[in-house]
Regions:
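Extended surface/linker regions that mediate inter-domain or inter-protein docking
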Residues: 1-119
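The −1 position to Zn-ligating cysteines in a subset of zinc-ribbon hairpins
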Residues: 51, 124, 203
């Protein structure tokens, strides 16, 4: 173990603190606000408080990420959406009224590849690339009530859309990434290039990770490769040259 994170609600705000484990794994102590580099010689870092807040508050919706209806609707044990609905404790924080959510509409659409990829992007990217003001106007999170793959925000904001803020990066084939998601061509998709990088200023997620998530990368890659490669042809994007 390297780190435990504790979050709680105070009188008017969220508070959070990271605890670093001792080398003998018998105790923890509050990590310094600047974080810890190469914690216990693992090659992994405990992020600084500033780095933590860059994600835990990005959209202004809430400080907690990874705790929403879509992610809780599973059968893997522990706390689930079904538990919260049964207890009657699930509420819409913006109105105080019971949330209009059910086990039927809190689902990811599409086939198995699409559901896996949308779930991964929602949980790992959608908290910054989502909400009322998504980063780079790219929506990678999903919403309750989706019934078809075309309903997913990524289909409108990333598939066949030109890259922004990351132009001129060379891909595996000596060319340049131009589209965020190039249907049928994961190797040409900027989102894959970002996920594959661990270069500061290029990698995604931008903080809190210094190793590529190979399983997640393969999941998103498989979905992009399964998309119809001609889906951009009806309205080909005119992207500026790198």
């Amino acid at each position: 173990m390297l780190e435990n994170i504790s979050s709680g609600v105070g009188y008017d705000r969220w508070t959070a603190i990271s605890y670093a484990w001792s080398a003998d794994q018998h105790s923890v102590s509050a990590a310094p606000s600047a974080g810890v580099t190469n914690a216990l010689g693992s090659g992994l870092d405990i992020p600084s408080q500033t780095a933590c807040r860059s994600c835990h508050n990005m959209t202004g919706a809430d400080a907690v990420i990874g705790f929403n209806a879509l992610q809780l609707n599973h059968d893997d044990g522990a706390l689930t959406l079904a538990d919260l609905l049964l207890r009657g404790t699930l509420v819409n924080g913006s109105t105080g009224n019971p949330a209009n959510v059910s086990l039927d509409n809190a689902v990811f659409p599409g086939d198995a590849k699409a559901r896996a990829a949308l779930g991964y992007l929602h949980g790992n990217c959608g908290h910054c690339h989502g909400g009322p003001t998504p980063r780079a106007e790219q929506r990678l999170g999903s919403v309750i009530g989706m019934t078809e793959l075309q309903d997913a925000p990524i289909m409108d904001s990333a598939v066949c859309k030109c890259l922004q803020n990351w132009r001129g990066r060379e891909n595996d084939f000596g060319g340049f990434y131009t589209l965020r998601v190039s249907p049928g061509h994961a190797e040409l998709s900027g989102i894959i290039g970002r996920m594959s990088s661990r270069v500061r200023g290029e990698q995604m997620p931008p903080v809190g990770t210094n190793r590529v998530d190979q399983t997640g990368l393969a999941t998103v890659r498989a979905w992009i490769d399964s998309l119809n490669s001609s889906s951009c042809d009806a309205n080909p994007p005119s992207c500026p040259a790198p």
